[in-house]
């Protein structure tokens, strides 16, 4: 059975056909509409899936935000242009006439990355560092989503009580500091207004402020990982996302994690499926996982 998998992120929308063998084909992308109106997202999703839907028997959605009763509830609306709520399952069923499931994108990615691990691993945490910071937790070999869909939203744990206000309403969240949006928001002077990609480029060219911003992000993530180890005693942490997979970033996180007491050390791995983990995880879950 072929699944039409959709990944809804803060920067881009992606869709692909995924067969029972896990092979991805006909992958497509569109920018995420920067609009508070549900109609803008619906129109973008329609354009994305219309060339693919005739070749699929079901739809699986991996989306940023809390997924509850098939709807997207934005924990940080800034990541979706201010959109607060969107009926994901209902909308895609109307657009495609296919049975549809939905799950948080980081939770979906966690499940895909867990399947790629070698050895006897039952406890794993996945972290994505991208427009925002998200996560997924596998414990006892099972994906934890929680009764309200909140499990794994580790980007909204506290990093600095005196830090910037996060879009979720809290102050000093990991996401407000370590994410691509957080990196860009802290830039000053000649870097003011630059996006995270530009800041990484400037850091590679020796710009001291850019390097400081990236080190600040990596240090914040390392402290989060130490907290995660203390909370879950996970066997490994897998890191993905556009920032998490940027050249040199994971090595920085490892350097800062090594400065924590040994009890909080844990193996760090780069995401095996890289930017396709959300699509693959949603498709895998559609094959039999009850959400």
From Swiss-Prot:
What Gene Ontology molecular-function terms does this entry list? ATP binding; N-acylmannosamine kinase activity; zinc ion binding
**Where does the chain bind ATP?**
5-12, 132-139
List the catalytic activities from the record.
an N-acyl-D-mannosamine + ATP = an N-acyl-D-mannosamine 6-phosphate + ADP + H(+)
Claim: Lipid biosynthesis is one of the keywords in the record: no
A single BP term in Gene Ontology: N-acetylneuraminate catabolic process
PROSITE patterns from the entry? ROK
Q: In which pathway does it act?
A: Amino-sugar metabolism; N-acetylneuraminate degradation; D-fructose 6-phosphate from N-acetylneuraminate: step 2/5
Q: List the disulfide bonds.
A: none
Give the Enzyme Commission number: 2.7.1.60
Keywords assigned by UniProt, alphabetized: ATP-binding, Carbohydrate metabolism, Kinase, Metal-binding, Nucleotide-binding, Transferase, Zinc
Q: Can the keyword ATP-binding be found in this entry's annotation?
A: yes
For the ligand (Zn(2+)), the binding residues are 156, 166, 168, 173
Could you say which enzyme class this protein belongs to?
transferase
SUBUNIT field: Homodimer.
Q: Which family does it belong to?
A: Belongs to the ROK (NagC/XylR) family. NanK subfamily.
Instruction: Briefly state the protein's biological role.
Output: Catalyzes the phosphorylation of N-acetylmannosamine (ManNAc) to ManNAc-6-P.
Q: What is this protein called?
A: N-acetylmannosamine kinase
State the organism of origin: Escherichia coli (strain SE11)
Gene that specifies this protein: nanK
